[in-house]
């Protein structure tokens, strides 16, 4: 039995199946963890969602910012843009079923036996694991409720950027959503910077990648796996932190990490060239 962690798929269905074949993934035996952003930019988001949904309990995923944006489009809150290549999914006969399944997926995965945490963008350095789990459950409950369009309409925005237990309502939910699905850089005190998308070597002072700040989660012995940040190309992270987005939808690769022995697998994108961007 293996635990296979895979970075952002972004609609790259054929690469996903290539990678699972390379890693000898068997859903009857193994468990697949996905860092989110299953959809958008790649050519076949519909096939990706159908396949991952079909895996049932053999797949554990977290929602990414593009997955949340898909929910907002389907709810009529955001506009469907051609560059996202989502029209076949939005017009599919099983779209309702797929969307309702997707909005009931978590934004945080924790396995205490593996000492492993997964979130699309990472874990705020201002949080311990208990706080992260509590905040994630609040967002998940809202997404699963009949009020989810109200939340999706209010989730866009960069503030507040500083965690406090006194945060409440939509402000609290927005901070959690940004920390788990959009974060890249923080100020030295752990406050979120939602502007910079540069590679770490080009980021202006005093910004630092979130994983370069002290982390109560890592200090408690947990490792953190995340996606979202393709320009890292899986590198530049400290021990216990695993960056898995290697830019498949931009012409890079799709990467998997087998947790038990930390062996990595990758397959090339079927797209002709790499145009790495931060999204």
UniProtKB/Swiss-Prot annotation:
It catalyses: P(1),P(4)-bis(5'-adenosyl) tetraphosphate + H2O = 2 ADP + 2 H(+). The keyword Hydrolase applies. This is Bis(5'-nucleosyl)-tetraphosphatase, symmetrical. Keywords: Hydrolase. It comes from Edwardsiella ictaluri (strain 93-146). One of its GO terms (molecular function) is bis(5'-nucleosyl)-tetraphosphatase (symmetrical) activity. It comes from the Bacteria. Its EC number is 3.6.1.41. The keyword 4Fe-4S does not apply. Hydrolyzes diadenosine 5',5'''-P1,P4-tetraphosphate to yield ADP. Belongs to the Ap4A hydrolase family. CDD domains: MPP_ApaH.
């Amino acid at each position: 039995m293996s635990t296979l962690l895979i970075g952002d798929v972004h609609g790259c269905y054929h690469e996903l199946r290539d990678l699972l074949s390379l890693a000898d993934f068997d859903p009857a035996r193994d468990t697949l963890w996905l860092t989110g952003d299953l959809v958008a930019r790649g050519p076949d988001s519909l096939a990706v969602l159908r396949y991952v949904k079909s895996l049932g309990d053999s797949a554990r995923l977290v929602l990414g910012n593009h997955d949340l944006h898909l929910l907002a489009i389907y709810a009529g809150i955001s506009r469907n843009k051609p560059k996202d290549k989502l029209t076949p999914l939005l017009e599919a006969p099983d779209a309702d079923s797929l969307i309702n399944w997707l909005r009931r997926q978590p934004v945080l995965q924790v396995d205490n036996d593996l000492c492993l945490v997964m979130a699309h963008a990472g874990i705020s350095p201002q949080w311990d694991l208990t706080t992260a789990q509590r905040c994630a459950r609040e967002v998940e409950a809202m997404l699963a409720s009949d009020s989810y369009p109200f939340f999706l309409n209010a989730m866009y925005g960069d503030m507040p950027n500083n965690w406090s237990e006194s945060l409440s309502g939509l402000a609290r939910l927005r901070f959690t959503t940004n920390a788990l699905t959009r974060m890249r850089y923080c100020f030295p005190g752990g406050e979120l910077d939602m502007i910079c998308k540069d590679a770490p070597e080009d980021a202006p002072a005093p910004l630092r990648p979130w994983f370069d700040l002290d982390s109560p989660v890592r200090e408690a012995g947990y490792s953190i796996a995340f996606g979202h940040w393709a320009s890292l190309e899986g590198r530049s992270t400290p021990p216990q932190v695993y960056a898995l987005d290697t830019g498949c939808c931009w012409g890079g690769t799709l990467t998997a990490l087998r947790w038990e022995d930390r062996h990595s697998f990758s397959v090339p994108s079927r797209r002709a060239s790499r145009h790495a961007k931060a999204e």
